[in-house]
Amino acid sequence: MMKKLVYISILSLLLLSSCRSKRMITVSLPRPAVYADSTLLGDTIGLPARLSPMFTFDQSDLRNVCRQPTKGKAKKQQIKKTSPAQKAIVQRGTRITSTTIHVGSAYKGVSRIKTYDFTHRDVPAAFEGFRIAFVSDLHYKSLLKEEGLKDLVRLLIDQKADVLLIGGDFHEGCQYVPPVMAALAQVKTPLGTYAVLGNNDYEACYDDIVREMRHYGMHLLEHKVDTLRRGGEQIFVAGVRNPFDLAKNGISPTLGLAPDDFVILLTHTPDYAEDVPVTNSDLILAGHTHGGQVTLFGLYAPIVPSHYGQRFLSGLKYNSKHIPMIITNGIGTSQKAIRMFAPAEVVMIVLHRLTD
């Protein structure tokens, strides 16, 4: 208890000291940002009055779409859903709803599963209900230790995903690369595992990671586009090589794709999707921010590894071209092995075809 009070006191001091420099880390947007997490679904949907007119909201079929409580094994583990658990936003051609499930002590090292039902006009019919598991920033062994890694793998297997996507920053030391890759290789999905690398991975142990990924048949997306095929149809997953080196990687790998393709762009940092034109991308997945790692009740993070400040902290956001971005808090930590009001999470995305 005393330790938590000390952390909260330190956080309060950091917050006060950061007020003077707040202008340095906050970017003025050309138009109001629209966040899914600001729109709660209940008997009515409350919408900010200043929403940009380019967003068209359709409330007709957004009710009663919460996932049913998990049965069987998960029920015994007392996994609980938050209340209110669902948030939604509709953009022209896209509908997104989210559900958060807190897993409690059922899985060490992971606090919650955040599921996004992502409905888009370019999703092929064969990909209706397609399940994507997305994790990032394991930083093994930081806060994530052996038991936590085992439980993370068990949780991912329990999700029965069709594909596993990983956003980079696998390790906190080269000696940890083989065990973390061996563990992730236990997660078998119909379409395999695809990953990009993070700044930690480029700074150290790059060759070790590439070698281990090849050994286990994982797909490394370094400015590369791969095709996911199902039922005679296809979608594309593209990955960014070192998004911090824009001199070499400042052209998006999605530029060669067609506007009516359904394209997922995987990048370690969300900043890349604002710094670089990511044309033809329909959904961007990113990590790196850790959700702030240490925040003031989840509302404000004194330190954010982004030159856009709080803008791309966590959750569903949009870049200036109104492309949706899902930014995960990740699993592990950097610098200090502590999280405060920035829960470690696994993200699930379920694809649906928008037909109306």
Q: What feature does the model see in each segment?
A:
Residues 1-5:
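Positively charged n-region of N-terminal signal peptides that target proteins for export
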Residues 8-14:
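Bacterial N-terminal signal peptides
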Residues 135-136, 163-169, 192-199, 221-224, ...:
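Active-site neighborhood of phospho(di)ester-bond hydrolases with catalytic His/Asp-centered motifs
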Residues 109-111, 123-211, 216-219:
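Membrane-embedded segments
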Residues 9, 19-131:
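Acidic, histidine-bearing metal-coordination/catalytic regions of metal-dependent phosphoesterases
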Residues 111, 120-133, 218-219, 226-239, ...:
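Beta-strand-turn-beta hairpins that frame and shape the catalytic cleft
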Residues 185, 270-350, 354-356:
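Conserved beta-sheet core of the metallophosphoesterase superfamily
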Residues 93-94, 100-105, 117-119, 181-246, ...:
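Extended active-site neighborhood of metal-dependent phosphoesterases/phosphodiesterases
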